[in-house]
Amino acid sequence: MIVVKAGGRTLLNNMDEIVKSISRLEKAVFVHGGGDLVDEWERKMGMEPQFKVSASGIKFRYTDEKELEVFVAVLGGLLNKKIVASFASYGRGAVGLTGADGPSVIAERKKKVIVQEKVGERLVKRAIAGGYTGKIKEVKTDLIKALVERGLVPVVAPIALSPEGELLNVNGDQMAAELAKALSAEYLVLLTDVPGVLMDGKVVPEIKSSEAEEVAKKVGPGMNIKIIMAGRVASGGTKVVICDGTVPDPLKCLEERSGTWVVP
């Protein structure tokens, strides 16, 4: 079993190659982002996307009720079904779903979040309402396993369900990591728009899971959460690679051992 995750920018720029590469796998689950497309649709509707930075330096989309509606419609609907259609064009059956289906992914709605903001020259931390953002608490694998066993590729949008029945925006990298752990996946592949984790302009070939959180502090928003999640998954025995999703046949990184590998 291989779990693959691609962020929105990477996916939108190279969907055919990513889907074609996954289509060759016997057993695969695909988790997708799509924030850029959400931003585009929000602006069409006269809304401005909201982003915050957590106290730990993780950039995230702040999701109020109106933004949640667009997020679910675009990621759980339009983009998700475009990906399913792309799989069909390569002769591979796929089923589009979210973590709310089943339900497969249960998350706790964040009541408050601590964010950091620049006020003049100072970095100030303050608490704000959590909106419709969730932290994953439980993964139920029955539905996803059943689809995989039938030779289908589950295409999962990063939307979870709260115990109270609320739809929640969850981080796509966390969604992929939690699914990989729950499914005891052999590999978790995080496709991004750079060749791997970069330091001083060079790809870091390997990171130990015990060092992941420290390394994450040295890289920018977007990559830091990938490294943190990769470290947590790798510590459980799943092989994790962060590699270039913009190239032809991006999953060749598994054979070539390219990109950045996160190891126990």
Swiss-Prot record:
It is found in: Cytoplasm. The gene is lysZ. The record marks 5, 226 as: Transition state stabilizer. The keyword ATP-binding applies. GO terms for cellular component: cytoplasm. Transmembrane segments: none annotated. PANTHER family: N-ACETYLGLUTAMATE SYNTHASE, N-ACETYLGLUTAMATE SYNTHASE, MITOCHONDRIAL. Pathway: Amino-acid biosynthesis; L-lysine biosynthesis via AAA pathway; L-lysine from L-alpha-aminoadipate (Thermus route): step 2/5; Amino-acid biosynthesis; L-arginine biosynthesis. Belongs to the acetylglutamate kinase family. LysZ subfamily. GO terms for molecular function: acetylglutamate kinase activity; ATP binding; N2-acetyl-L-aminoadipate kinase activity. Substrate binds at residues 34-35, 61, 169. Involved in both the arginine and lysine biosynthetic pathways. Phosphorylates the LysW-bound precursors glutamate (for arginine biosynthesis), respectively alpha-aminoadipate (for lysine biosynthesis). Pfam families: AA_kinase (PF00696). This is Putative [LysW]-aminoadipate/[LysW]-glutamate kinase. It catalyses: [amino-group carrier protein]-C-terminal-N-(1,4-dicarboxybutan-1-yl)-L-glutamine + ATP = [amino-group carrier protein]-C-terminal-N-(1-carboxy-5-phosphooxy-5-oxopentan-1-yl)-L-glutamine + ADP; [amino-group carrier protein]-C-terminal-gamma-(L-glutamyl)-L-glutamate + ATP = [amino-group carrier protein]-C-terminal-gamma-(5-phospho-L-glutamyl)-L-glutamate + ADP. Keywords: Amino-acid biosynthesis, Arginine biosynthesis, ATP-binding, Cytoplasm, Kinase, Lysine biosynthesis, Nucleotide-binding, Transferase. The keyword Amino-acid biosynthesis applies. GO terms for biological process: arginine biosynthetic process via ornithine; L-arginine biosynthetic process; lysine biosynthetic process via aminoadipic acid.
